[in-house]
Amino acid sequence: VRLDEKAALRADLDAYLIVHADLVDPARRHGEPTHQPYYDAYWSEEGRRPFWILAGGARAGFVLINRHAPSGLACDAAVAEFCVLPAFRRMGLGRAAAHRAFALAVGQWELQVHRANPVGMAFWARAIATAPVAGATEIPLEDRVIHRFRTA
């Protein structure tokens, strides 16, 4: 994502986070703005990278990658946010995008999925199971599952 596309990504991220936050915390007010204190760091901090998911040249979603493991364990890369826009879902694009993202960094990866998001739970289980990764494990927590795996 180029710097001049930052506002477009922010709009997509906000829309995604509003829906996602409503899944995770049903008590919050629907449509309440989201707070992303590290958003600007994706263009200035080493290890943070924003990417578009493209379909035929059209923006079909985004991936935010950083090095901050949800488990607190050491990792080389983590999927911070991942979104395929609704019009592009159920076409295999998300799985292909996840696999391409995993190829961006060699080493230990992590991502977390909230249990309140069963579609996301199923998606990530399939995406990881079909990816060229090793040592895939899950850390089950009360409200979420953390996936860990290695890429070569």
Task: Describe these PLM feature segments.
Residues 135-152:
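Charged phosphate-binding loop/patch that engages nucleotide di/tri-phosphates or the phosphate backbone
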Residues 26-50, 54-55:
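Active-site rim helix/loop that mediates acceptor-substrate recognition in acyltransferases
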Residues 1-12, 17-20:
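A short beta-loop-alpha structural element at the N-terminal edge
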